[in-house]
Amino acid sequence: MIFTQLIQTNLRTKELGKNIEYYNRLDSTNTEAWELIEEGNQHGTVIVTDNQTIGRGRMKNTWSMIPGKGVAFSLIIENCFPSNYSGLISLASGIAVVESLNKRGIETKLKWPNDVFANEKKLGGILSETKIIKDKIVKVVIGVGINVNETIAEHPKDIRDYMTTMLEISKHPHQRELIIAEFINSIEHLFHDISIDPKILINKWLNNCLHLDKIISFYENEIIVEGIFSGLDSNGFAKIEMNNEIKTFGSINLV
């Protein structure tokens, strides 16, 4: 069981995490977050579960969680950002996960735009969703899933070769509440970076990028193509060198 009081005891935030909604079981914490928004839940609310059964990822991907061992939570943000800041919000979420796990002794890297890797294998993922009204982002839901205290063998066979867990890396269990608390602490500070100077955020992300200046493969018009990941533009979009030309992509699926 996740103890919400332990999360709040370890918060150093001014706004985020003051209200935490815990559920034994949920289809998706992001889905529940949007339902709570419709019911009037406010900025900073955290939705956390011990058993997420239909975790959602980008491009209709799903997320496998082992009940009582992984981390699955969502954070509601109510703020007015320009509509082109969606990519920056996703970057901030990734950095917050890296900073949180670093405090637990787990060195991680980010695969654009939202995957968290350790030892070249997937450790976690992020799904950021926004509601835009009149060219302004007015609602944000950030969903985070991390493999924590399970073994690789507990996951489906078809993904075992490509994923890892904090337990497998460190050889000891981790307090899941502290991971969540540190993420919330980090993300509040990172949103301040967005409002002051997005370049600060972009540089932080690039410093933690798994594949900067490396050849990557991705789908373009349902065909796998290759290019060199050369950085990010001011909106957090990927800059990829293809045939000696830099192309910018706001949404692609890296292989």
Residues of each region from the PLM?
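N-terminal lobe of the biotin/lipoate ligase/transferase fold
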Residues: 1-100
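Long, positively charged amphipathic alpha-helical accessory segments at protein N-termini or as interdomain linkers
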Residues: 2, 6, 15-16, 91-108, ...
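Short loop/edge segments at beta-strand edges and connector loops
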Residues: 24, 110-112
